[in-house]
């Protein structure tokens, strides 16, 4: 089990790399994360929902993701509450206190999923969450040492040296564990190192002497891995000298599945800009409203930032707009939440840019989807997925045709505004080319996104093979 001294220490990446190392050896391996808190999620083949990081790790294993790889997924929908996904299905909304009490019940489900994976696979690589040394979260813990003790698994602890204080992080984390938990820790990994390793050796010697635990590896800082993030937005880009398309995405307070835009960010011909609080939406060919876990609240936030007026001005100047999932719902005339699915029951007036009305319902649509997009008399095949509550009634043209034959999405009479429920909408090369032509007449050739992810996974595995003591780790 890989645990970390902090969030974003490199747990997800290390597990993905170790999974690929084992898969290369012909070992049947699967990833597992008992509890994940993230708004970036993926749909499994059997119609369940898990954290996106576990889907990437499953890809590293060369296996299909299943709900048992992430049995508890927490999707925050307010500062104090979240939707709880249990073995792929929405259980209920809980506040922090309610979930803290529920964890003692959830442990049984977590162990059930883990048992199913251990029965099917030769090896299971487990990822913890946050830090095992969060004193206030130790009771009923299912994410870190609480699970490790119940499942009786060995642990390695990873820390990020790039943020500073790596020896304090590792030494302090170990010191805050119980004696039995300390005995379970087999070693440390230092992540994101850059520089001369010789300058680090005295510190490594000190750490090993003080803790009695070996440093199993020092991993280099790997830029541009192109893997879908668990939650944090990545804005890093390498642009060509002649950008063909300027895209702006407003960052909503509960933005979800912003991995939709990775394929745009990684294209050197596209300047993707995330607009945050206090910033204006301007200088764009295309504005994309992203998905959100709290549509009505984020619609209020969008208006509080003046972005509704920015979008109207953008359209008057001939710009294009696309809404994805929750962003699609916002573009309509009305969002009705009669049962309080996302908070207090009530209705919100939409932006009125598409002739649709949406009713939020208790049931969640979870499916992997194939469709055909038709724009300006041309077509392209879309491969995406749906994760949403609610149904939208559409009046007027619909630009997508699902493989089932059902129409999907909506497009305005003026032809400048479009919406769809499909996440992953831009991933296919033909779709991006067709959309860019619709936006400003340019032809953009998309890189193979799956190939980029594979390259990133292999780079991690290569670094692990070179810089970690795998003989000790896997003995």
From Swiss-Prot:
CDD domains according to UniProt: CobQ_N, GATase1_CobQ
Domain GATase cobBQ-type: 244-431
Known pathway: Cofactor biosynthesis; adenosylcobalamin biosynthesis
Hydrolase keyword on record: no
Nucleotide-binding keyword on record: no
Any single biological process term in GO: cobalamin biosynthetic process
Name of a matching Pfam family: GATase_3
Alphabetized UniProt keyword annotations: Cobalamin biosynthesis, Glutamine amidotransferase
GO molecular function, one term: ABC-type vitamin B12 transporter activity
Entries under PROSITE patterns matching the protein: GATASE_COBBQ
List of catalytic residues: 325 (nucleophile), 423
Family the UniProt entry places it in: Belongs to the CobB/CobQ family. CobQ subfamily.
Function: Catalyzes amidations at positions B, D, E, and G on adenosylcobyrinic A,C-diamide. NH(2) groups are provided by glutamine, and one molecule of ATP is hydrogenolyzed for each amidation.
Protein's name in the database: Cobyric acid synthase
Source organism phylogeny: Bacteria, Pseudomonadati, Pseudomonadota, Gammaproteobacteria, Vibrionales
